[in-house]
């Protein structure tokens, strides 16, 4: 049956494929930073959040996502190491080449989820590299789970 409603929040505009944005179940909220998003704009409790952000750390974003989550829900977050590590760890072209730095970036995000009371349910290297070739990760959290 699929999703009954999807809220798509983006600081940009017109980023979503028109075939998706035309779907009546999709509510597009463009030009909106999640840090300024009001609960009244997403009145439903969210069962699943899929987070793919750039130029900002998930350390900032995930606590904001948490405001909208249902008591028992899930979060899938794409971890982009270049936005999680110190600038000195980011090489030419925005690539994080040091495997230890990438691991630290992933662990940092997992720690954020745990501080929010989320259970880490999985972590894997993304099968798709970032646009510039960065190795990225997918983190899966369960919100409101018994630990």
Tell what function each PLM region has.
Residues 82-121:
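C-terminal substrate-binding/active-site "lid" region of AdoMet-derived donor-dependent transferases
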Residues 128-147:
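Core SAM-dependent methyltransferase catalytic element
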Residues 16, 80, 133:
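Residue-level signal for inorganic ion chemistry
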Residues 4-60:
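S-adenosyl-L-methionine
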Residues 72-81, 85-86:
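Conserved beta-strand signature within the Rossmann-like core of class I S-adenosyl-L-methionine
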Residues 59-76:
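A short glycine-rich, Lys/Arg-flanked "PGG" loop and its adjoining helix->strand segment in the class I
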Residues 30-32, 122-125:
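Short loop/edge segments at beta-strand edges and connector loops
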Residues 1-5, 73:
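Conserved S-adenosyl-L-methionine
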């Amino acid at each position: 049956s699929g999703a009954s409603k999807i809220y798509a929040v983006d600081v940009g505009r017109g980023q979503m494929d028109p075939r998706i944005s035309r779907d009546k179940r999709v509510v597009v909220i463009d030009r909106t930073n999640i840090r300024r998003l009001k609960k009244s704009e997403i009145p439903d409790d969210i069962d699943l959040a899929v987070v793919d952000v750039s130029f900002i750390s998930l350390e900032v974003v995930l606590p904001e996502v948490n405001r909208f989550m249902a008591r028992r829900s899930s979060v899938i977050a794409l971890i982009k190491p270049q936005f999680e590590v110190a600038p000195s760890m980011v090489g030419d072209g925005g690539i994080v080449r040091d495997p230890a730095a990438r691991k630290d970036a992933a662990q940092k995000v997992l720690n954020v989820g745990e501080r929010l009371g989320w259970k880490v349910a999985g972590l894997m290297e993304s099968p798709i590299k970032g646009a510039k070739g960065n190795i990225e990760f997918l983190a899966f959290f369960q919100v409101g789970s018994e630990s």
